[in-house]
């Protein structure tokens, strides 16, 4: 007998997951997608299996805006293990070198200013970046090491929260593309003892914080009690990650033409940049960009939610 294909639901919005330890970002996404029985899903940038914390998951129409969350700033807390370096720059790798730890709080505090502001990082081999279509981590597992171009990132804040024995707990606010494993490893080299990431927790992604997240266990319990539709209550609006963008409200006439791909004028539009747009009934209908002539050109449109 042929297997009956599961009919997925057309649901839209963002669920802020507190990603559990040991899950890849995609595994967490697929689990929540199953709980929702959602037709379309995507996440907004990977967290290592070792990492926990804020992982925005986009469903339906919200996937059209995931790139803007991917580009947003992030915040982390990490526990650095001093005195050792590993193949992966975290606790999941093999130890490459062990050195004595002779530094204390004052030494760590003195080293941190070197890593604030705009800095250069060489991405780790164990990363999802690709070389000739092949993820670097696959090359690394095969024993290959390839040259990686340094990348410029911004560390807006780097603070020492605690220092105990041969560990240091750090808090970091950083730009997209920052590798906390590389940051910790570089700090360890600056201290002369080496270091790797023992724990990593993302505390903020763009406008989203840990206080807004839901755990996988909570979602599973709600699903067990009420099925797919019960999980819908955790869905945030598709534009939740864009609330700091200028908001324009179009008339019914302007909304019609704009939704058909026509640039329109808006008297209260900013002089430049991206905007989010609502129709005359207050429904989010997409994002646009202010053109040179002052009209709002549609960039990403959505169906009514």
UniProtKB/Swiss-Prot annotation:
Reactions catalysed, as given in the entry: uridine(55) in tRNA = pseudouridine(55) in tRNA
Taxonomy, superkingdom: Bacteria
Record: active site: 48
Enzyme Commission number(s) from the entry: 5.4.99.25
GO molecular function: RNA binding; tRNA pseudouridine(55) synthase activity
Record key words, sorted: Isomerase, tRNA processing
HAMAP family, alphabetized: TruB_bact
Protein name: tRNA pseudouridine synthase B
Taxonomic source organism: Pseudomonas syringae pv. syringae (strain B728a)
Gene name in the database record: truB
């Amino acid at each position: 007998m042929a297997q009956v294909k599961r009919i997925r639901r057309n649901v839209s919005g963002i669920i802020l997951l507190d990603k559990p330890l040991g899950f890849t970002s995609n595994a967490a996404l697929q689990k929540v997608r199953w709980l929702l029985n959602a037709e379309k899903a995507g996440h907004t940038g990977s967290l290592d299996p070792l990492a926990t914390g804020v992982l925005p998951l986009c469903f339906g129409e919200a996937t059209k805006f995931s790139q803007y969350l991917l580009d947003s700033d992030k915040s982390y807390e990490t526990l650095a293990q001093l005195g050792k370096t590993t193949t992966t720059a975290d606790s999941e790798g093999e130890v490459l070198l062990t050195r004595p730890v002779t530094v204390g709080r004052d030494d760590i505090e003195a080293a941190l200013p070197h890593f604030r502001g705009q800095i250069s990082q060489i991405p780790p081999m164990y990363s999802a970046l690709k070389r000739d279509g092949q993820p670097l981590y696959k090359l690394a597992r095969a024993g290959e090491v390839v040259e990686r171009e340094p990348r410029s990132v911004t560390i807006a804040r780097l603070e020492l929260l605690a220092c105990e024995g041969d560990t240091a707990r750090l808090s970091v606010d950083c730009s997209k593309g920052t590798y906390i494993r590389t940051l910790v490893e570089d700090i360890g080299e600056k201290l002369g003892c080496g270091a790797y990431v023992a724990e990593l927790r993302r505390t903020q992604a763009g406008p989203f914080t840990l206080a807004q997240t839901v755990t996988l266990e909570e979602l599973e319990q709600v699903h067990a009690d009420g099925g797919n539709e019960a999980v819908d209550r955790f869905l945030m609006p598709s534009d939740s990650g864009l609330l700091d963008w200028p908001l324009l409200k179009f008339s019914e006439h302007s909304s019609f033409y704009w939704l058909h791909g026509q640039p329109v004028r808006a008297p209260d539009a900013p002089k430049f940049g991206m905007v989010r747009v609502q129709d005359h009934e207050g429904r989010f209908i997409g994002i646009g960009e202010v053109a040179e002539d002052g009209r709002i050109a549609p960039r990403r449109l959505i169906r009514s939610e």
